[in-house]
Amino acid sequence: VSKSKPTKDLTPGRLGYAFDWERLDELEERGSDAELVLKQYRDTFPKFDTTADPLGVLKVFDQGQQGSCQGNALAQVFSICYFLATGRHETFSRSAGYYLAQKRDGISGDKGSTLSGGQWVATQHGMCLESDWPYPSRYNPAMPPSAEGKFNFKLKATKPLKDIDSVLAWLDSSLPIQIGLTWNGTCDQEVVSNYSSRSGGGHSTVFWQRRASGNIVNINSWGTRWNGDGVHEWTVDSVKEALRGRWTVFIGYAPDGMSFPAPKAIS
């Protein structure tokens, strides 16, 4: 994939998915078939509260004035998978998710990152906790000494999910999907019911869980003031439309049995 400049529509503090730099070949090579990952997950981990409300498990992040949406989304994915694997709550490093992905991408400066860079962090390099590499108030990719040797967490990732059946099967197994797409006014709704990919800047968020209506919960990184609680919903039809987008990438993640402590239920 040619590396042109990241999208001109990228706005620090709101967006940050540098889709012009995306490497689809690496996403395919590092990812596994979704059905295989699902089987391994079901065979390895016990079932905790798989109907948990996302806001009861996660802390909604605010990326502030950085184009770090991908790193914020990846950190949420790790928190979800950690909960599913152990029944416990933990916060993972947004800085590691963003700055290490940028390093892999070859992007310098606060210009966003790619899902392929994030996938490399999740499956190859490893992630650390937020307490090991705290999120700074302004762009600062320098890794602190406290993060040295702390990248002990990894995940399994799928190849890009390209059809609605695969997406729903993943979500209905209570597993998260990191998404990257063009974000525009059709996305700034309580329920996204008429998504269009024709314009907008690159943004990355997390799909996790479905409401009784069948709508999919989307976890954003613009703080709790956005939409009143930091999350909103997408209809299945809007997700279908998103999958047709030129710049859309959906990656399913699951716990890696070799990278988490022995499962322990919440007491």
Each model region followed by its residue ranges:
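Structured alpha-helical subdomains that flank or immediately precede key functional sites
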Residues: V1-G67, G71-E90, D110-W120, Q124-E130, ...
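Predominantly the structural core of cysteine protease catalytic domains
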Residues: S2-S4, K8, A75-S79, K103-S267
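Acidic helix-start/capping segments at beta-turn-to-alpha-helix junctions
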Residues: H89-D105
